[in-house]
Amino acid sequence: MIIIDTGCANLSSVKFAFDRLNIKAEISRDIATIKSADKLLLPGVGTAMAAMKILQDRNLIETIQNATQPMLGICLGMQLMTEYSSEGNVPTLSLMSGHTDLIPNTGLPLPHMGWNKVRYEQDHPLFAGIEQDSHFYFVHSYAVLPNEHTIATSDYGVPFSAALGCKNFYGVQFHPERSGKNGAQLLKNFVENL
């Protein structure tokens, strides 16, 4: 398992989440290491524009786009998997269709921060052993509205994609590394089931 070094703040907490599961995970930006990994994790905290610049500066965009092994994007990492983000009006990785937009104003404060229910729409291996409507921890102001790649939703005034999946690419808007036993189970499922 390689955690792609995106330079974001949650790298260590993601690695510690795997350590707690006794799953060997290494943080790397080395292209050869990333290409040879059995699984990849794309973490992200911050803005889409800054994250894409870091990926470009580290020559990682093409490597990520050409990955054939299972990859899990977390929070901004999931958003980067789509085609475009209105956060900075930046093209993203285009690993699946869809775009990321500011959560529509429904009178609720932004960012959406805290625990929220997740309802998975399909019997997906990423959610094996996790009860329907389980709570996960979110911190975000931008989201991907439900589309053909949505495998789970949550609601913050409007429904949004809590998880996406397309081919070997998966993403979660919430932070599994901060979501207790449900998050730990999801990370374990990613490693063991995908």
From Swiss-Prot:
GO term, biological process aspect, one: L-histidine biosynthetic process
UniProt cross-references to PROSITE patterns, sorted A to Z: GATASE_TYPE_1 (PS51273)
Pfam families reported for this sequence: GATase (PF00117)
Catalytic residue list: 75, 175, 177
Keyword terms of this UniProt record: Amino-acid biosynthesis, Cytoplasm, Glutamine amidotransferase, Histidine biosynthesis, Hydrolase, Lyase
Catalytic activity: 5-[(5-phospho-1-deoxy-D-ribulos-1-ylimino)methylamino]-1-(5-phospho-beta-D-ribosyl)imidazole-4-carboxamide + L-glutamine = D-erythro-1-(imidazol-4-yl)glycerol 3-phosphate + 5-amino-1-(5-phospho-beta-D-ribosyl)imidazole-4-carboxamide + L-glutamate + H(+); L-glutamine + H2O = L-glutamate + NH4(+)
Main subcellular localisation: cytoplasm
GO cellular component terms listed in the entry, alphabetical order: cytoplasm
Name of encoding gene: hisH
Source superkingdom: Bacteria
CDD domains: GATase1_IGP_Synthase (cd01748)
Assembly, per entry: Heterodimer of HisH and HisF.
EC number annotated for this UniProt entry: 4.3.2.10, 3.5.1.2
Places the protein is found: Cytoplasm
The protein's role, per its UniProt record: IGPS catalyzes the conversion of PRFAR and glutamine to IGP, AICAR and glutamate. The HisH subunit catalyzes the hydrolysis of glutamine to glutamate and ammonia as part of the synthesis of IGP and AICAR. The resulting ammonia molecule is channeled to the active site of HisF.
Name of the protein: Imidazole glycerol phosphate synthase subunit HisH
Ranges for domain Glutamine amidotransferase type-1: 1-194
Pathway(s) the chain acts in: Amino-acid biosynthesis; L-histidine biosynthesis; L-histidine from 5-phospho-alpha-D-ribose 1-diphosphate: step 5/9
